[in-house]
Structures are given as structure tokens and as C-alpha cells.
From Swiss-Prot:
InterPro entries recorded: PP2C, PPM-type-like_dom_sf, PPM-type_phosphatase-like_dom
Gene3D superfamilies with a match to the protein in the record: PPM-type phosphatase domain (3.60.40.10)
Protein name: Putative protein phosphatase
EC annotation from Swiss-Prot or TrEMBL: 3.1.3.16
A GO molecular-function annotation: protein serine/threonine phosphatase activity
Length: 260
């Protein structure tokens, strides 16, 4: 994993005051002067959440660093992502079968993922689950991911208010994660844009965005003396607002990255 460069990217991941362990993961990796950033959130309700998030995150970092990209475009990065996602599933299955000898409490270990690939001109965002990516500029925070949860799935199906109400206690349940289910269809979210006037890219887990209003992201970051202080201030604000989860943020100064 590439060490953070506080001039244009950094990150932070902490357990928080409630959880017994930190099941989040974040990291950075380079390939041909292009940058990958990733945040994973292991499923807290299951055994092995920390194992899953670390295995998945580290695999994406290492395979990005070692892959020979012939070109940097949407088709190429999507193909790389899909192949790496397949490998992640098989590694989770292998981990379950060999390391944990198919112990039933580890059968549902899984992780979310949000991942950004940055060239000097483009941003490619992939996600699975409910970890998020925001683009920040002009005192605004634009959410560019869409949570894979029951609510969004029902809305996409044009569910009426009555049906939504009947699932009111389950609407935030995840409908897509990275798990050991190797035969499931590959489903992921994707977003691509040019680096223009955007100032920051923020990837984060729900322990942060559920407890800090996105309208405050830009102010907190730009009022901090550097990126390292910015991610700590985001963490501190989520604690002040009673976050009950692990808290992870990975932050890139896009203009400094573009010029580096």
C-alpha cells in the first residue's frame, strides 16, 4: 500500500467509541503515475467482517499496482475491475474453506467497497454496497455513488408508498456486497468524469456520512490546515455527532493531484 502523501492525498480509519474492532479498511496504490484509492467496510453483523474488508481492499491495491494497463479508458478499467472482483470472491471462498475450515459463523463474511482510479484527466469510481464517494467543489458536496440497499432497489422498481412502508425496518439492508458467492452475477456501480474544477474527492464509510451532513464536508476540509488535519476533523465531527460505527475517510486534493 502506498504511504499517504499529505500534499494531495491521505486517509484515516478508526474504530469509533462503540464497536469492538475496526472492520473498515482504506488504502492507496500507484500504477504508471495513476492513483487508486479504496475504502472497504466489513459487514459488522457477521464474523469475519474485518478479514473480508482487509482481504478485498489489499487485493485491489496489489493487483492495481502490478497490472500492465495498455491504455487508460473506461473499457480497460472496467475489465480490470471485473477481473479483480472475481478474484476477490474466490479469495474469500478460499479463505473460508481453508483458513476457517468452513466454520458456519464465517459463512456470510463480506465487505462493501468504494474505489477511485485517478489519471491526470479522469476519475473512475466503482462501488459495491453503501460506502460512498463525494466530489467537493464551490462549497458543495456531490454524491456520485448510489447505495446498494433495499430502499434504492424498491424505488428503481417504482414501488409505491405502501410497499415502502411495509419494508420500513429493512430499507437500509444491503442488496449487494463482495462475498464468497462466486457464481453471483457481477453487479457494481460505476461513475466517470473529467477532472475539471472539482477540488476534492472523498471516499468514506457510513460511520462518517451518516453522522456528518455532506453540506459541512467542504467547510471542514477547507478550514483545516492540511489534508491530514481535514480527515481527522471529519472523524472528530462524526464522534461529536454520536457515530456508533467505524469511521473511515480517504481524501484527495484533485487540483494538486492533477498538477503533481
Amino acid at each position: 500500500m502506498q504511504a499517504a502523501n499529505d500534499h494531495f492525498f491521505t486517509g484515516l480509519s478508526k474504530k469509533g467509541p462503540v464497536r469492538k474492532e475496526n472492520q473498515d479498511f482504506y488504502g492507496f496504490s500507484f500504477n504508471q503515475n495513476n492513483l487508486l484509492i479504496v475504502v472497504c467496510d466489513g459487514l459488522g453483523g457477521y464474523k469475519g467482517g474485518k478479514i473480508a474488508s482487509n482481504l478485498v481492499g489489499k487485493l485491489f491495491l496489489s493487483l492495481f499496482e502490478g497490472f500492465e494497463f495498455n491504455q487508460w479508458d473506461e473499457t480497460t478499467v472496467k475489465k480490470w475491475f471485473e477481473n479483480t472482483l472475481i478474484q476477490a470472491r474466490f479469495q474469500l471462498e478460499n479463505c473460508f474453506q481453508t483458513v476457517y475450515e468452513a466454520q458456519i459463523q464465517f459463512a456470510r463474511m463480506a465487505s462493501t467497497l468504494v474505489l477511485g482510479i485517478l489519471t491526470k484527466s479522469d476519475i473512475y469510481i466503482f462501488w459495491i454496497g453503501d460506502s460512498r464517494a463525494y466530489l467537493l467543489f464551490e462549497n458543495q458536496a456531490k454524491l456520485v455513488t448510489k447505495d446498494h440497499n433495499l430502499y434504492n432497489q424498491l424505488v428503481a422498481m417504482n414501488a409505491d408508498e405502501k410497499l415502502l412502508l411495509s419494508y420500513s425496518n429493512q430499507l437500509l439492508a444491503l442488496t449487494n456486497t463482495i462475498s464468497k458467492e462466486t457464481k453471483r452475477p457481477l453487479v457494481y456501480g460505476f461513475y466517470n468524469t473529467k477532472i475539471e474544477q472539482q477540488e476534492f474527492l472523498l471516499l468514506c464509510s457510513d460511520g462518517l456520512y451518516n453522522f456528518v451532513e455532506k453540506e459541512l464536508f467542504f467547510e471542514i476540509i477547507t478550514n483545516s490546515k492540511n489534508l491530514k488535519q481535514a480527515v481527522f476533523n471529519l472523524y472528530r465531527k462524526s464522534i461529536e455527532n454520536a457515530s456508533n460505527d467505524n469511521i473511515t475517510a480517504a481524501l484527495v486534493n484533485l487540483q494538486k493531484w492533477k498538477q503533481s
